[in-house]
């Protein structure tokens, strides 16, 4: 069983509520089969809660009730599965191109009984038109200049991108500003999330998208 500190437990209880047992089970999947199949490095096991699960799950506070969420490059389900557990009101599509990861994700979804999750094997750019999303999430996929092109088109013209980023978020926004505007991004900001829950809060880039409709 993966150890959880008192502070991490308090944060997890706040975020997951009565679904905390599902979150714990998910963490066990990450620590066992997730590590065995190369989705998570073995050195990450002691910090699965702090660096991965809680770090991702806190962004649920930024997602409107009942949203359809597409998680790009879902990998080990970070943040997609964290959001599905914390927020049963959300409808999640996990977009992941690698078959071995897709198989693992589906196994975890089935084991946890998450009926608000669809796992899709696809590259993000090929999923456009096949996914309906109000919010697109991503973590550690690529630089924001590239990430904008992978995420914004999935919104179909309006919605939000919420990307978990590091300390260079502001610098990335400057470099990506032109690409974001071209794709329909009207407002881009850096947010700090979970500062009242986590020792190291999560930095996210939020892109509000409202692409003008083409005149017929």
Swiss-Prot record:
Q: Which SUPFAM superfamilies match?
A: S-adenosyl-L-methionine-dependent methyltransferases
Describe the function of this protein.
Specifically methylates the N7 position of guanine in position 518 of 16S rRNA.
Q: Which UniProt keywords apply?
A: Cytoplasm, Methyltransferase, rRNA processing, S-adenosyl-L-methionine, Transferase
List where in the cell it is found: Cytoplasm
Query: What is a GO molecular function of this protein?
Result: rRNA (guanine-N7-)-methyltransferase activity
**What are the cysteine partners in each disulfide bond?**
none
Provide the top EC class: transferase
Specify the species.
Pseudarthrobacter chlorophenolicus (strain ATCC 700700 / DSM 12829 / CIP 107037 / JCM 12360 / KCTC 9906 / NCIMB 13794 / A6)
So where does S-adenosyl-L-methionine get bound?
73, 78, 124-125, 139
Q: What is its EC number?
A: 2.1.1.-
This entry carries the following GO cellular component terms, namely:
cytosol
The organism's place on the tree of life at top rank = Bacteria
Family label: Belongs to the methyltransferase superfamily. RNA methyltransferase RsmG family.
The protein's predominant localisation is cytoplasm
Protein name (database record): Ribosomal RNA small subunit methyltransferase G
